[in-house]
Swiss-Prot record:
Name under which the protein is recorded: Pleiotropic drug resistance protein 1
Membrane topology per record: Multi-pass membrane protein
Induction or repression: By terpenes such as sclareolide and sclareol, and by some phytohormones such as jasmonic acid (JA) and ethylene. Strongly induced by compatible pathogens such as the fungus B.cinerea, and the bacteria P.syringae pv tabaci, as well as by non pathogenic bacteria such as P.fluorescens, and P.marginalis pv marginalis. Weak induction by incompatible pathogens such as P.syringae pv syringae (at protein level).
Pfam families reported in the protein's UniProt record: ABC2_membrane (PF01061), ABC2_membrane_7 (PF19055), ABC_tran (PF00005), ABC_trans_N (PF14510), PDR_assoc (PF08370)
Keywords: ATP-binding, Cell membrane, Membrane, Nucleotide-binding, Plant defense, Repeat, Transmembrane, Transmembrane helix, Transport
Membrane spanning residue stretches: 534-554, 567-587, 622-642, 653-673, 679-699, 707-727, 764-784, 1184-1204, 1214-1234, 1270-1290, 1301-1321, 1327-1347, 1358-1378, 1408-1428
Domain of life the protein comes from: Eukaryota
Family: Belongs to the ABC transporter superfamily. ABCG family. PDR (TC 3.A.1.205) subfamily.
Species of the source: Nicotiana plumbaginifolia (Leadwort-leaved tobacco)
Stretches the record annotates as Disordered: 796-826
Length: 1436
């Protein structure tokens, strides 16, 4: 971290603490913010004042208070003083002011904070402070145990039924109670930095959430938490304290500056203004003249409008984010800032607020140790000087960061094992018989000493036999330790509430007024709409294409007004127009869902209420609706031959505006209720279906059953369609009466559909739609206010954990005995392997020059990322690949492993002396990716069996394969977790550290000779990192070649490596060689370079090495470390080694395999199908929800269209029956297609890893993915067919039921395969859903229901035959009714003749229809397979 980062950080933390404490009362809160921000200002107050400046101050002092607080003295670049209105200060003024205040952060920040404190102390204003106490805190959760914890199809149903019965007290729940925190008590004191340590699953996050007042309501809590003696219900803890999550949730389209500025504006000025007024009054009374820069800064930071800008700029500088301030934060779809920067944005977002107490959860993930040190040091200065309160959990704090803390809280298995001064924690453990080794970081020791696996190595009482001391025993011993007794005595003394500063605790729910909240949210929504303009333009363009198609299908020259049939075509056209405009609002659903996680976070932090978020998302979409509907109506109205009256033209425009707004509001509401794409799309389909089927067009009002008539009257679509029909058919051109008629043709057409032909129904429709718009938007706001997100981490206990007698937490590997892994390393493995070395000489990797660099004047065609890199990795030697960010560590590893998908590679790479060939190399190598990509719905054991099945040679029988899998599980200590579900990261399943070990094991079961590991310890705490490194070490000791990239390791992790390959920025090596005992060879090499500072005793050699080889050190010393290395004896020895290993040994031969893959095609298919079986069976969110949805829809259709299959005496009866088929095909088909897309998308990321590892070819994978759907869709079609066929009353003959089942089964199938295909040919799920959505619309238009085939213009009829829904509808209708000779009472035709003449359906064509529908399914499945094989959207 740069010096500026540190300073920035400090100030920001300072400001946060200050604000928090002051905001509780009236205004002093703001003081704190001021102090933070003003701090740097104070560092300038040594300036001598000239006479002119004195005169200006005198003039300011004479102003009224309000004006005086809005004017300040600002110094220009020449040093001249000028009076400035704070409201008018611009970007340049703010920038100059900050430049003067924050010069060199590391040097000036503390001075600045002290000066700020002195200014406030000088006039006798007190800083508020908060002491947080928690007493006898117990937190319990309910969890399923063992196999019931797996989310299988049957468990999903059982849990659902059980939960229902439990809620009405019929049957008790089978959940087991799990205690997360066990009777914990303690004090977090102001002015002191407290570090929270503990292994994963120990309850750290739960404790932080409990203290911040943000616990999930589902947890059972006893005990109490107090701030300055006040319980949480007495004030607003969410605004008094800031909880900084370990998860980085931000809106990707906003820049870093905009993200922080929005947060600052929402959290408000707090009490800064009142504090400043009091400060100014006292200074005036005491005739004290403040520093001009500080005064200006404080005034800007307490002025509405200016405050957010000034505070944000300051925080950006302190956090070192000023270099990326105007860069998008980014997400999966948008390239943005790095992970470490994103982590700092998460911290900054809360620190710009006025909270005085900070609860920070793993804020250092992804940061290097120097940046973490800088941030924590700044927080420490702020906390000490400004009386802040901070409890911070860190994963792997380096010794220098650990030493910044005053107090330690050590959690283990829900117990507080130690809480007290840092200096005395080691004394406590020594009193228990455990000592921290000399070269061991104290933080690492503390996290390992309570672990069953690690504890014994620290036992020092050689005269006593060792036994495992449980966390409970430690906690009991701590109570009698002198530190524990002191804390206990303090807790017995109640905090005197009268001593609590009135500004310490906040009682106002929101930081700013209602009008300002609405303004801030509106401005952000407008910004996001501008950033997402492409989406709106794309929607507009898509609507334009559909409009052009629609107007050419319903072309005015083909649209006569001579008969009821003609009226039917107009009705179909108008119905489609309404449906099209309504479905255009569907895009609100994914856009709303996408922003919900950030909304929930900000809502829970009380940034704004739900209505302030909901209103702008409604109002600002109205102009978009105007543009879209305007384009549609102006383009299509006259071309389609609607009534030429201009009044009716504008009435249609108004109506469609309201339809679009109603639909948008409805989909926003559904998104807020559904909260996940799966649930929301299911709800959405359900709501649409009710509207669609009961909208009066598909099923006429007279035919709606009494039990569904309520749905007809509450369907917005009914009012929309009735109004648009009345608007058209009440026109002059429809007033004539046809032969045999008794009323005008227009009225007859409307009445035939069961609608109301009276003109006033247009205005009833308009009024109803306006009412629905208001109702849905209010419901949307209410849903946002009261519903919480679904996807929260789920508590599960494995069978092994349940059976374990240990006191330790069931979720953690350390609870299991297991030294067998270390014993195995000397025995060798069940399966032999050939050791291989890898050498590379003068390797150069380059890519095409990025366009932006070309534009900046670079003339080279290629950008070189690796420059002539050479080295050798040998069997049984563990090599660390290290370097600063941008050094090319991962790039080198990807090049060697053959994982690069682009670029140019030059140089020599050899395997045991033979040139490397990627197809054979993939068979003997493994690559552990940093991202831990695994199928979420299989267990640990199944993941390993699957990998071994596909990657071990064919001659390894099943018994040996299973033995090898067991051995590997033992080696990486996964045996206790064999039945644990892998799960989704951060939601359920394995912890981060367990996933890392699974990644290693998945590669090990392939029995590779060479293994590459990318950052195997990143994101882990010290104890977890030690477990992973032990697994890595065990792997190397079996004689394999292992290379790891590693980021800022602790001393003992670093010294677990045998050799180091150190690179500098620009892709060049600067040290390649052995580490030696206690890194002696490495230290000797660099200390021999003149000017390099010597390492301090006990200092981490890895940290020292990166510090002394930084580019700034190169410049300071005037050397190039690459040149020094290439002139050294070490380099010459390495080149000799490379030459030696580049020659094949006698008696060896080049790698050769008879086939590309380890297993034959059929075995690949079976293995992939086996995994897909478990993935589907354990994914009830997809499989069970789809079946339940289908069952509900079937029951709805059955009751809605009850017995209509037996009535075919009228034209309308046939239309009703067709309508039931059309609606079912469209809705269930689209639901199948949409719901399969996220499933395939998640599995495709796993597929990319497995394919790169050479596990199988793309075709078996695609075959399995296609095949696994068939049984589930068979069940779906059977359930639907039996329910609907019997309830609708179709004719019970074997042939007719078979045809109905056949067409529905293959329709569900081709829709599902179509959804899979769209994912395979597009880069991500979002694009796939957009592409699919376009096709749904076109298929709907050409389905043959809205416009029968004979009425489609000849120039479009060809597409009818290319529309799968048209073929399905043809098959369903022709098979049921195409052979009926019954006469229709309102037609002079039989049913068969009517279907032939009006729809072109022929019963004897069924065989062809069946073949075509099967062909659609086959073509879509085949295209899916080709897409998976041909397209790789992963870029490396």
């Amino acid at each position: 971290m740069e010096p500026a980062d540190l300073s920035n950080l400090r100030g920001r933390s300072l400001r946060a603490s200050i604000r928090g404490s002051m905001r509780g009362s009236i205004r002093e809160n703001s003081n704190s913010i001021w102090r933070n921000n003003g701090a740097e200002v104070f560092s300038r107050s040594a300036r001598d004042e000239d006479d002119e400046e004195a005169l200006k101050w005198a003039a300011l002092e004479k102003l009224p208070t309000y004006d005086r607080l809005r004017k300040g003295i600002l110094f220009g670049s020449q040093g001249a003083a000028a009076e400035v209105d704070v409201d008018d200060s611009g970007v340049l003024e703010r920038k100059n002011l900050l430049e003067r205040l924050v010069k060199v952060a590391d040097e000036d920040n503390e001075k600045f904070l002290l000066k700020l404190k002195n200014r406030i102390d000088r006039v006798g204003i007190d800083f508020p402070s908060i002491e947080v106490r928690f007493e006898h805190l117990n937190i319990d959760a309910d969890a399923y145990v063992g196999s019931r914890a797996l989310p299988t199809f049957t468990n999903f149903i059982s849990n659902f039924v059980e939960g229902l019965l439990d809620s009405i007290h019929i049957l008790p729940s089978k959940k087991r109670q799990v205690t997360i925190l066990k009777d914990v008590s303690g004090i977090v004191k102001p002015c002191r930095m407290t570090l929270l340590l503990g292994p994963p699953g120990s309850g750290k996050t739960t404790l932080l959430l409990a203290l911040a007042g943000k616990l999930d309501s589902a947890l059972k809590v006893t005990g109490k938490v107090t701030y300055n003696g006040h319980e949480l219900h007495e004030f607003v803890p969410q605004r008094t304290a800031a909880y900084i999550s370990q998860h980085d949730l931000h809106i990707g389209e906003m820049t870093v500056r905009e993200t922080l500025e929005f947060s600052a504006r929402c959290q408000g000025v707090g009490s800064r203004y009142e504090m400043l007024a009091e400060l100014s009054r006292r200074e005036k009374a005491a005739n004290i003249k403040p520093d001009a820069d500080i005064d200006m800064f404080m005034k800007a930071a307490s002025t509405e409008g200016q405050e957010a800008k000034v505070v944000t700029d300051y925080i950006l500088k302190i956090l070192g984010l000023d270099i990326c301030a105007d860069t998008m934060v980014g997400d999966q779809m948008i390239r943005g800032i790095s992970g470490g920067q994103k982590k700092r944005v998460t911290t900054g977002e809360m620190i710009v607020g006025p909270s005085k107490a900070l609860f920070m959860d793993e804020i250092s993930t992804g940061l290097d140790s120097s940046t973490t040190y800088s941030i924590v040091n700044s927080l420490k200065q702020s906390v000490r000087i400004m009386k802040g309160t901070a409890l911070i959990s860190l994963l792997q704090p380096a010794p220098e960061t650990y030493n910044l803390f005053d107090d330690i809280i050590l959690l283990s298995d829900g117990y507080i094992v130690y809480e007290g001064p840092r200096e005395e924690v080691l004394e406590f453990f020594e009193s228990m018989g455990f000592k921290c080794p000399e070269r061991k970081g104290a933080a690492d020791f503390l996290q390992e000493v309570t672990s069953k696996k690690d504890q014994q190595q620290y036992w020092i009482r050689r005269d006593e036999p060792y036994r495992f001391i449980t966390s409970k025993e430690f906690a009991e011993a701590y109570q009698s330790f002198h530190v524990g007794r002191k804390v206990s005595d303090e807790l017995k003394t109640t905090f005197d509430k009268s001593k609590s500063h009135p500004a310490a605790l906040t009682t106002q729910k929101y930081g700013i007024g209602k009008r300002q909240l609405l303004k801030v949210c509106t401005e952000r929504e407008l910004l996001l709409m501008q950033r997402n303009s492409f989406v709106y333009l794309f929607k507009f363009f898509q609507l334009l294409i559909i409009a052009l198609m629609t107007m050419t299908i319903f072309f005015r020259t083909k649209m006569p007004r001579d008969s009821a049939e003609d009226g039917g075509i107009y009705s179909g056209a108008l119905f489609f127009v309404v449906i099209m405009i309504m479905f255009n609002g569907l895009s609100e659903l994914p856009m709303t869902l996408y922003k919900l996680p950030v909304f929930y976070k900000q809502r829970d932090f009380l940034f704004y209420p739900s209505w302030a978020y909901a209103i702008p998302s409604w109002i600002l979409k109205i102009p978009v609706t105007f543009a879209e509907v305007g384009m549609w109506v102006f383009l299509t109205y006259y071309v389609m031959g609607f009534d030429p009256n201009v009044g009716r033209f504008f009435k249609q425009f108004l109506l469609l505006l309201l339809v679009n707004q109603m639909a948008s509001a409805l989909f926003r509401f559904i998104a807020a209720v559904g909260r996940t794409m799966g649930v929301a799309s299911t709800f959405g389909a359900f709501a649409l279906l009710l509207q669609f089927a009961l909208g009066g067009f598909i099923l006429a009002r007279n035919d709606v059953k009494d039990w569904w008539i309520w749905g007809y009257w509450t369907s917005p679509l009914m009012y929309s369609v009735n109004a648009i029909l009345v608007n058209e058919f009440d026109g002059q051109k429809w007033k004539h009466i046809v032969a045999g008629g008794t009323e005008p043709l227009g009225a007859a057409v409307v009445r035939a559909r069961g609608f109301f032909p009276d003109a006033y129904w247009y205005w009833i429709g308009v009024g109803a739609l306006a009412g629905f718009i208001v109702m849905f938007n209010i419901a949307y706001s209410v849903a946002l206010a009261y519903l919480n997100p679904f996807d929260k981490p789920q508590a599960t206990i494995s069978d092994e954990s349940e059976n374990n007698e240990s006191e330790s937490s069931p979720q953690i590997t350390s609870t299991q005995e297991g030294d067998s892994a270390s014993e195995n390393k000397k025995k060798g493995m069940v399966l032999p392997f050939d050791p291989h070395s890898i050498t590379f000489d003068e390797v150069v990797y380059s890519v095409d020059m990025p366009p932006e660099m070309r534009e900046s004047g670079t003339s080279d065609n290629r950008l070189v990322l690796l420059k002539s890199v050479s080295g050798a990795f040998r069997p049984g030697v563990l090599t660390a690949l290290m370097g600063v960010s941008g050094a090319g560590k991962t790039t080198l590893m990807d090049v060697l492993a053959g994982r690069k998908t682009g670029g140019y590679i030059d140089g020599s790479i050899k395997i045991s002396g033979y040139p490397k060939k990627q197809d054979t190399f993939a068979r003997i190598s493994g690559y552990c990716e940093q991202n831990d990509i695994h199928s979420p719905y299989v267990t640990v054991f199944e993941s390993l069996v699957y990998s071994a099945w596909l990657r071990l040679p064919q001659d390894v029988n099943e018994e040996k394969r299973m033995m090898f899998v067991e051995e590997v599980m033992d080696l990486v200590e996964l045996t206790p977790l064999r039945s644990a579900l892998v799960g989704l990261p951060g939601v359920n399943g394995l912890s981060t550290e367990q996933r890392k070990r699974l990644t290693i094991a998945v590669e090990l079961v392939a029995n590779p000779s060479i293994i590459f590991m990318d950052e195997p310890t990143s994101g882990l705490d010290a104890r977890a990192a030690a477990i992973v490194m032990r697994a890595v070490r065990n792997t190397v000791d079996t004689g394999r070649t292992v290379v790891c990239t590693i980021h800022q390791p602790s001393i003992d992790i670093f010294e677990a490596f045998d050799e180091l390959f150190l690179m500098k920025r620009g892709g060049q090596e600067i040290y390649v060689g052995p580490l030696g005992r206690q890194s002696c060879h490495l230290i000797k090499y660099f200390e021999s370079i003149p000017g390099v500072s010597k390492i301090v005793e006990g200092y981490n050699p890895a940290t020292w090495m990166l510090e002394v080889t930084a580019s700034s050190q190169e410049m300071a010393l005037g050397v190039d470390f690459t040149d020094l290395y290439k002139k050294s004896d070490l380099y010459r020895r390495n080149k000799a080694l490379i030459d030696e290993l580049s020659v094949p040994r006698p008696g060896t031969s080049d790698l050769h395999f008879d086939s590309e893959f380890s297993q034959p095609f059929w075995t690949q298919c079976m293995a992939c199908l086996w995994k897909q079986h478990w993935s589907y069976w354990r994914n009830p969110a997809y499989t069970a929800v789809r079946l339940i949805f289908t069952t509900f829809i079937a029951l709805i259709f059955g009751t809605m269209f009850w017995d209509i299959g037996t009535k075919v005496s009228r034209n309308q009866d046939l239309v009703n029956a067709m309508g039931s088929m059309y609606a079912a095909v469209l809705f269930l088909g689209v639901q199948n297609s949409s719901s399969v897309q996220p499933v395939v998308s998640v599995e495709r990321t796993v597929f990319y890893r497995e394919k790169a590892a050479g596990m199988y070819s793309a075709i078996p994978y695609a075959f399995a993915q296609v095949l696994i759907e068939i049984p589930y869709i068979f069940v779906q079609a059977t359930v639907y067919g039996l329910i609907v066929y019997s309830m609708i009353g179709f004719e019970w003959t074997v042939a007719k039921f078979f045809w109905d089942f056949f067409f529905m089964f293959f329709t569900f199938l081709y829709f599902t395969f179509f959804g899979m295909m769209t994912v395979a040919v597009t880069p991500n799920q979002n694009v796939a859903s957009i592409v699919a959505g376009f096709f749904y619309t076109v298929w709907n238009l050409f389905s043959g229901f809205i416009v029968p085939r004979p009425r489609i213009p000849i120039w479009w009829r060809w597409y009818y035959w290319g529309c799968p829904i048209a073929w399905t509808l043809y098959g369903l209708v022709a098979s049921q009714f195409g052979d009926l000779q019954d006469p229709l009472t309102d037609q002079n035709q039989t049913v068969e003749q009517f279907l032939r003449s009006n729809f072109g359906f022929k019963h004897d064509f069924l065989g062809v229809v069946a073949a075509v529908i099967v062909a659609f399914a086959v073509v879509f499945a085949f295209t899916f397979a080709l897409g998976i094989k041909a397209f790789n959207f992963q870029r490396r």
